[in-house]
Every structure is written in C-alpha cells, then in structure tokens.
Amino acid sequence: PDKCIRCLRCIEACRQVQGIGVIKLDHTGTNAAVSFGGPWGESETCIQCGQCALVCPTGALAVKDQTDRALDWFDDPAVTTVVQFAPAVRVTIGESIGARPGENLQGRIVAALRKLGADCVMDTRWSADVTIMEEGTELLERLLRQKEEGTLHGHPDTMFTSCCPGWINHIEKNCPDMIPHISSTRSPQAIFGALAKTWLPKSLGIPAERIRSISIMPCTAKKDEAARELLKHGGEPDVDLVLTVQEFAAMLDRRGIDLMSLEPAEFDSPFMSEGSGAAQLFATTGGVMEAALRTVSALAGGPDLGRIAFEPVRGLVTFKEAEVETEAFGKLRIAVVHGMRAADEVIRMVREGRSPYH
C-alpha cells in the first residue's frame, strides 16, 4: 500500500476494460485511495486476470513471483524439471532484451533454459495441437447436430473456446449459465502438464514423483489455472509452477545469461515438441477459434479456408467478426473478442437468443 500513488489505473483496468469492478476506492475527495483491505483474488468476482498488476506503475500491485522456487528446482539433482513454453513467448521475450520486434528466439530460449538447469525443454505447440483436435472435433459435432436439427443458421448454439483461464473464471463466477456453451477441452498448458506427470516419466524411466512441471506463459492468469483442483491428480498439480515472461527474463538476468549470445538449441523430445501451423495461431488473439474452424473444415473434407477477413463490430477494435464459407455447412459466422467487457456483449447476445455466431 505504501507504493500506491492513487493513479487509479488498476480500478480503470478492472472496471472499464474488464467490466469486473472488484477493486474499490476507500473514502472520497482528497482522501480517496485504492482499497488494500481485502483479498481481491479471493473475492467472488475477481477472475485472476492480472490486468491490475499489469498497469500498476509502482509495484504496489505485483504478480506472485515464483522465480526462487524454479531456480531451486533447477539446482536440485534429485528433481527432474520439465519446462514447456507457449508460442507467444518466443517473440515476447525479445521486448525485455532489446531484440528486434517479432524476432523468433525459440532456439535461444531452449539453450537458456538448459543453461539454467532444466532437464527437459519442450514445446507447448504440441499440446496446442491436441487441444485443437479435441476442440475442433467438439465444434464439428455441434455443427452436425445443429444441421440435423435445422438450427444451424439464424441463431445457432454458440460455442466459446476454453483456453483462457481468466475467461473461464469469469464464466464460472459471474456467468454460470454460459457453462454449456464452453468447450470441454483443456488448455494446452493443462494437457501438457497431465502428460508430463503420466506418460513422460514412463518414457524417461523415472518415478513421476521426481518430475517438476514448469511452464512459461505470456499470461498471469495461467498461474491460477495451474492451481485449479480439477487439474490435479492425487492432490498434486499437473503443472507445478508457472512463470510469466517477465519472471523468465528476471531469472536470466539473475544468472547472468545473455540470451542473444547463446547458440540456438533444439527441443528435447520430438513427441512433445513438434507443432503445426494451427498451434502457432494460439499466439494471436482469436487464434484458437481460427485454428478450430480450420480443423473443422479439414475434418469435414472441405478445402483450405484461405485468409479469414475480420471486420470490427460497430467500430470496436475489441470485437470483430467474419463470415466463412464452408463446403459442409455453408456460411459460418465467427467472432473474436478481446477483454471481458467485449466478451460480455457476446454473452448478452447468447442469453437473448440473438447470437448469430457458431
């Protein structure tokens, strides 16, 4: 609280950008201050999105740092560390080290993790492909059912993607009536974590208890996802620890590792490290939806969809839509939203029976 300068950016991000409003002001006028009296993350409406910490200029709000724990595991010979990192990380890490915008640093990240002490370094794109096959198949089944029922066009049974943990928290806490519209597929992080604790130990010939599964993600909310009870087996989490890109950059700095001076290295296991172009789309806003739609078209025997042209809805950059012509289902309408406030607009459409999106 002593670091708070009353800029109110956190309140603005929570209330205006996300539409949640869990952060409050204490008092009024010159005595106004952000309330630090209650545990926001434990409130009934906080979605653990991390946007408040993102905009805080002084560090009064900060992400829970887990770098010490990760470094301890890297240094422990009795522990086998398995690290995955998301497609976006290979580009976003460059912002912290002065690399060219958009430069792909995948190989150097792998080399840096080995230098830190990671035993296995693998690619989240592999589990992203698993997610897409599951989610694409689920969407295909929904479309086939609606086609048979004659409800495919007009106001279809809209399906939402399920990879964003902040979005899932928002649905569960604030819009539980929308749960039937959410894909049942786990996120790539969760799928990878489950396999890292089950299949991988057998493949490596070591006890599962030795594995510590670490992921590097571009989103703070992934920390909350890893702690979900539904993503544990025998009381132990599938993903033991999540580092943000900022935490990873801080670890490199602490150990004196210059990312740009390293020779690029390859991932450890091709079985859990090869990904398709569909998986690469996960790094972009709306990429999961686009990958699922392209998978549906392929599974239904249709041609490549080509470039999908999105148009802003009512001029909003946070809400865009597109019509896609498919061989099996005719025209399908899709939407991409950025931020919970924009997502709430689609939720209202679904509730009122006027959503045109599939």
Question: Residue locations for each model-derived region?
Answer:
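Cysteine-centered iron-sulfur cluster-binding motifs in ferredoxin-type domains/subunits
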Residues: P1-V17, G38-G59
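Short charge-dense sequence patches
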Residues: D2-L8, V22-K24, L54-D65, E141-R145
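Short N-terminal signal/transit or membrane-insertion segments
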Residues: E12-V17, K24, C56, V89, ...
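Non-heme iron-sulfur electron-transfer modules
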Residues: Q16-T45, G59-T81
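Iron-sulfur-associated redox domains of electron-transfer enzymes in respiratory
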Residues: A62-H358
